[in-house]
Regions:
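Core SAM-dependent methyltransferase catalytic element
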Residues: 217-236
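Class I SAM-dependent methyltransferase SAM/SAH-binding core
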Residues: 71-127
Length: 236
């Protein structure tokens, strides 16, 4: 099992969270227990993405296929679905995983066993210190809408990840927005409920704020909207 330790190394026990996570951050992570992760691909990537957020998971897989490299870091990998199905440029990519939830790290590591990924239990809202060489691609797929704060404050994640990128490296991902995008009434009700349950914190997340925060940090960037989801990439 994976233990979340302060050094971000692999150990043998399995607390759910890193000790230094804040209560607000912890709420968004602890919901991803083993039971939920067992139905995550069907419920989240299948039903919610298609029928509520109006962005089928194939669009997210296309983003991976376009931007992933053979030297990749995934922050908040969920179940590892996209890493399992995307096309890497080589048969033996270097893969590292960062998450604050040991369950997610364990499930993804097992799923990607053929790639021997290295796991680190870290909070992306804090400075990330890991003993590892920089990466050529970093994914933050479905992470931002689960983090506390607004796009303006939670974009500090990009500041923490930028030092982990090689020059010319790309950070990419997606996030579900509430402002500046079109949503159906069922989608809005679902989003409101997920915010009430503290699974999401995105009622103030705005499309223009995302574009602004990326542009302030990366000269070369792009944001594309499908449904109420923003798919983005930015180059260091």
């Amino acid at each position: 099992m994976v233990k979340c330790s302060r050094l971000g190394q692999k150990e043998t026990q399995n607390p759910t969270m890193a000790d230094r996570s804040t209560p607000e951050t912890r709420t968004g992570y602890t919901v991803y227990n083993k039971a939920l992760l067992s139905i995550y691909d069907f419920m989240v990537l299948g039903f919610l993405c298609r029928f509520m957020w109006k962005c089928r998971s194939r669009h997210l897989l296309e983003l991976y296929n376009q931007r992933v490299t053979s030297n990749h870091l995934d922050v908040g990998p969920g179940t590892g679905y996209f890493l399992d199905h995307c096309r890497f440029p080589t048969n033996r990519p270097r893969i590292a995983l960062i998450d604050l939830n040991a369950n997610s790290l364990s499930v993804t590591k097992k799923r990607l066993l053929r790639y021997a990924p290295v796991t680190y239990c870290k909070d992306a809202l804090e400075l990330i210190n890991i003993d590892a060489e920089p990466f050529d691609s970093v994914a933050v797929n479905g992470l931002l809408h689960c983090l506390p704060g607004t796009i303006r404050t939670k974009s500090v994640v990009f500041d923490h990840l930028k030092p982990l990128l090689n020059p010319g490296g790309v950070v990419f991902g997606c996030t579900i927005l509430n402002k500046g995008v079109k949503k159906s009434i069922p989608a809005q009700l679902t989003m409101n409920w997920l915010n009430f349950m503290k699974v999401f914190t995105n009622l103030q997340d705005d499309l223009e704020d995302l574009r602004t925060e990326l542009s302030q940090r990366f000269q070369d960037n792009d944001v594309r909207v499908i449904g109420c989801m923003a798919l983005f990439w930015a180059r260091k």
